[in-house]
Amino acid sequence: MSSPAPSTQAFSLKTRQPIPDEDALLTEEDRILKQATKGEDCTTRRRACKNCVCGRAELERKLEAEVLTMPPGGCGNCSKGDAFRCAGCPFLGQPAFDATEDGKVKLNLTDDV
């Protein structure tokens, strides 16, 4: 067996190129800060406005109804915790619970002292 032919380098580590000035890369248009206009609409808030006309309120109501009607997961690991739950589990992000409690979380409200 023969050794492979030496490859030619596409770059050299010995030559140093100067670091370009960041300010020289910007144009005058880039330097002008554009002020964002803030309006009173649903896009600036997390929830829909009281008098919502963009359709966000209807979408939120639809999503709430879907979440309430979600069936328990079919993998059987819903009660064990996030490490064991499947990707489509409706209990994802919630703490582990007893499987006989139907997804209700029991909090320990006693003092640790």
Curated annotation (Swiss-Prot):
[2Fe-2S] cluster binds at residues 42, 49, 52, 54. One of its GO terms (cellular component) is mitochondrial intermembrane space. It comes from the Eukaryota. Residues 1-15 have a biased composition (Polar residues). Residues 42-54 are annotated as: Fe-S binding site A. Residues 75-89 are annotated as: Fe-S binding site B. It is found in: Cytoplasm; Mitochondrion intermembrane space. GO terms for molecular function: 2 iron, 2 sulfur cluster binding; 4 iron, 4 sulfur cluster binding; metal ion binding. GO terms for biological process: iron-sulfur cluster assembly. Keywords: 2Fe-2S, 4Fe-4S, Cytoplasm, Iron, Iron-sulfur, Metal-binding, Mitochondrion. [4Fe-4S] cluster binds at residues 75, 78, 86, 89. A motif (Cx2C motif 2) lies at residues 86-89. Its cofactor is [2Fe-2S] cluster; [4Fe-4S] cluster. Residues 1-22, 33-113 are annotated as: Disordered. InterPro entries: Anamorsin, CIAPIN1. Belongs to the anamorsin family. Component of the cytosolic iron-sulfur (Fe-S) protein assembly (CIA) machinery. Required for the maturation of extramitochondrial Fe-S proteins. Part of an electron transfer chain functioning in an early step of cytosolic Fe-S biogenesis, facilitating the de novo assembly of a [4Fe-4S] cluster on the cytosolic Fe-S scaffold complex. Electrons are transferred from NADPH via a FAD- and FMN-containing diflavin oxidoreductase. The C-terminal domain binds 2 Fe-S clusters but is otherwise mostly in an intrinsically disordered conformation. Monomer. This is Anamorsin homolog. It comes from Leishmania major.
